[in-house]
A protein has these predicted regions:
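Transmembrane beta-strands of outer-membrane beta-barrel pores
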Residues: 51-55, 73, 84-88, 120-124, ...
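Membrane-embedded beta-strand positions of outer-membrane beta-barrel proteins
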Residues: 47-49, 80-82, 116, 152-154, ...
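Solvent-exposed loop/turn segments connecting transmembrane beta-strands
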Residues: 53-61, 89-95, 122-130, 164-168, ...
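Repeated loop/turn-to-beta-strand initiation elements of outer-membrane beta-barrel proteins
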Residues: 43, 75-80, 111-114, 146-150, ...
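Outer-membrane beta-barrel proteins
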Residues: 71-75, 108-110, 139-144, 160-162, ...
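Residues on the lipid-exposed face of transmembrane beta-strands in outer-membrane beta-barrel proteins
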Residues: 47-51, 65-71, 102-106, 136-140, ...
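Outer-membrane beta-barrel transmembrane domain signature
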Residues: 147-215, 219
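Predominantly the C-terminal beta-signal and adjacent terminal strand-loop region
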Residues: 201-252
């Protein structure tokens, strides 16, 4: 419990350093409704993981995992997240992606807030040895539950790309994101998030997910993610990536 109380303070002290050294993974969408006015407890966290293996004539495996931790104050929220996925077939790796990030939110009123978020991503099978993004701006909480929640936010940012061919690129960008959550029943929740990073090569991300609670701590998550890049690297020329995951989740 002492750790849960001290981590937010440490994040506040290290926030400036973290934003400068790393930067949200722009192939994912932050869908946690991190409004401190609606928080039921000072800390919320989850861990989701899924694994698929096949053997015989074809040998393949796929592993996905993600986690989000959020600490709430009276008018602030601090979040850390990470995700990982890799796939192999016949003992050869075909995809491998890792991302970590952090986010802060400050409520100016019950509906208006400021935010800042940053992350680091590596996805070498899609052409990115490293991608760092930092964004900050203004958001509006239009709906705040308990059944329906919706927020929209936007702001400027900067992105640094290091490609697998050795080239690098730094560019300014414009960021916008909308997230909707629908508490369908006591144990079933639907979420839809969309984010856009507008630059010379614009990226659009979407996550559609259904979470079903099994009990107080465990649940199932089905998610469909789409990432579209207007100008993908030459080493990974497809504009659109799609991923469907089914995972078991644990609530902290």
């Amino acid at each position: 419990m002492k750790l849960l109380k001290t981590v937010p303070a440490a994040l506040m002290l290290a926030g400036g350093v973290f934003a400068a050294m790393s930067a949200t993974a722009d192939d994912s969408v932050f869908t946690v409704m991190d409004d401190p006015t609606a928080a039921k407890k000072p800390f919320e966290g989850n861990l989701n993981a899924g694994y698929l293996a096949q053997s015989g004539n074809t040998k393949s495996s796929s592993l996905t995992a993600d986690s989000t931790l959020t600490w709430y104050g009276n008018t602030t929220a601090w979040s850390l997240w990470g995700n990982a996925s890799n796939t192999s077939a016949n003992d050869e790796r075909s995809s491998e992606k890792y991302a970590v990030g952090g986010r802060s939110r400050y409520n100016m009123t019950d509906y208006d807030y400021l935010f800042g978020q940053a992350s680091w991503l590596t996805d070498r099978y899609n052409g990115y040895r490293q991608r760092d993004v930092f964004t900050a701006g203004y958001g509006r909480q239009f709906l705040n539950g308990p059944v329906h929640s919706f927020r929209f936010e936007f702001g400027p940012g900067v992105r640094y790309d290091k490609f697998t061919d050795g080239d690098t690129k730094t560019q300014p960008l414009g960021y916008a994101s909308g997230t909707y959550a629908w508490q369908m029943t006591d144990n079933t929740k639907f979420t839809q998030g969309v984010s856009v990073f507008g630059a010379e090569d614009t990226t659009l991300n979407s996550e559609t997910a259904l979470n079903v609670d099994i009990n107080e701590h465990f649940g199932l998550k089905v998610a469909y993610n789409v990432t579209w890049n207007s100008s993908p690297p030459e080493t990974a020329p497809d504009h659109t990536d799609r991923r469907t995951t089914v995972s078991l989740g644990y609530k902290m």
